[in-house]
């Protein structure tokens, strides 16, 4: 009877080890609804299921000085204090930016990882994620910047990696195409700390990529919210819509218990045999 109980315990430990060896998150939206999102500022979900980050008037035209943010409703564990392990993640989304005929684009949108409970920051070129202070925002973002701001931007429209600042640590020029759907793929590999973001216009077969190493554990809290932030220009001549059409996200964080659990299971089995 004792051997039987020990064998059952060993098998349980093996199963428990595999069940708890990683924390994983996955979700996918082809249509959005408010139930699965935290909406801030002017962000809303349209009747057709699009995530509209910034405001439009009754004629569907973008408005000046709009700011909106939207995050997945559940927090994501991006690293583990006990083990020191960091998650890898992969996200895909499609967005569309439309600029009226009588205006220029401004200011852009960003995919962001922010502290849980984070509130919108400054409008305009700060994209709702940062402000002019020297605060530690505990924020990592990939920005799709449509307007040059002389205080921190390169001179061209660009895709940038932002770490605690609106001044990107790495940028690549971006040939923005008005009204065209853009498909974005962003990956983070924890073993190399490499963050890679690629944008493709499928209809034009053009692509743009930016990458750099980012130590998420040194920047972000253990638990974050993932989602989007966008702003329109603060003057009438520079406005745009900022719509997310679809979004998927997957992350995996190893909890470091696999080897410990197997060692304990082996110890129990050795006592039986």
Swiss-Prot record:
Residues annotated as glycosylated are 33, 92
Q: Which organism is it from?
A: Phaseolus vulgaris (Kidney bean)
Q: Which UniProt keywords apply?
A: Glycoprotein, Lectin, Signal
- By its UniProt entry, which InterPro entries does this protein fall under? ConA-like_dom_sf (IPR013320), L-lectin (IPR016363), Lectin_LegA_CS (IPR000985), Lectin_legB_Mn/Ca_BS (IPR019825), Legume_lectin_dom (IPR001220), Leguminous_Lectin (IPR050258)
Q: Which PROSITE patterns match?
A: LECTIN_LEGUME_ALPHA, LECTIN_LEGUME_BETA
Output this protein's name. Answer: Leucoagglutinating phytohemagglutinin
Q: Which family does it belong to?
A: Belongs to the leguminous lectin family.
Q: Give the residue range of the signal peptide.
A: 1-21
What the entry lists under Pfam families is as follows: Lectin_legB (PF00139)
For molecular function, the Gene Ontology terms on record are: carbohydrate binding
Instruction: Give the gene name.
Output: PDLEC2
* Xref: CDD domains: lectin_legume_LecRK_Arcelin_ConA
């Amino acid at each position: 009877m004792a051997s039987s109980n020990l064998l059952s315990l060993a098998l349980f430990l093996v199963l428990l080890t595999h069940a708890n060896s990683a924390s994983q998150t996955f979700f996918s939206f082809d249509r959005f609804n408010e139930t699965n999102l935290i909406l801030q500022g002017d962000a809303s979900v349209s009747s057709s299921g699009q995530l509209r980050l910034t405001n439009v008037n009754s004629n569907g035209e973008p408005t000046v000085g709009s700011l909106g943010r939207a995050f997945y409703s559940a927090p994501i564990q991006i690293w583990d204090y006990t083990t020191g392990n960091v998650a890898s993640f992969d996200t895909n989304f499609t967005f569309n930016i439309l600029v009226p005929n009588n205006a220029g684009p401004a200011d852009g949108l960003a995919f962001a990882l922010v502290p849980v409970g984070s509130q919108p920051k400054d409008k305009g070129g700060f994209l709702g994620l940062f402000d002019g202070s020297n605060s530690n925002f505990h924020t990592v973002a990939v920005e799709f910047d449509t307007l040059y701001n002389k205080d921190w931007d390169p001179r061209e429209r660009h895709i940038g990696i932002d770490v605690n600042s609106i001044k990107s640590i790495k940028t690549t020029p971006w040939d923005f195409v008005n009204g065209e759907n853009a498909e974005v793929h962003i990956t983070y590999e924890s073993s190399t700390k490499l963050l890679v973001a690629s944008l493709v216009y499928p209809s034009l077969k053009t692509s743009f990529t930016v990458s750099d190493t980012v130590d998420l554990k040194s920047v972000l809290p253990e638990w974050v919210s993932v989602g989007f932030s966008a702003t329109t220009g603060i003057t009438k001549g520079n406005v745009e819509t900022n719509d997310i059409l679809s979004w998927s996200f997957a992350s995996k964080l190893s909890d470091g218990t696999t080897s410990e659990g197997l060692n304990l299971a082996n110890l129990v089995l050795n006592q039986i045999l």
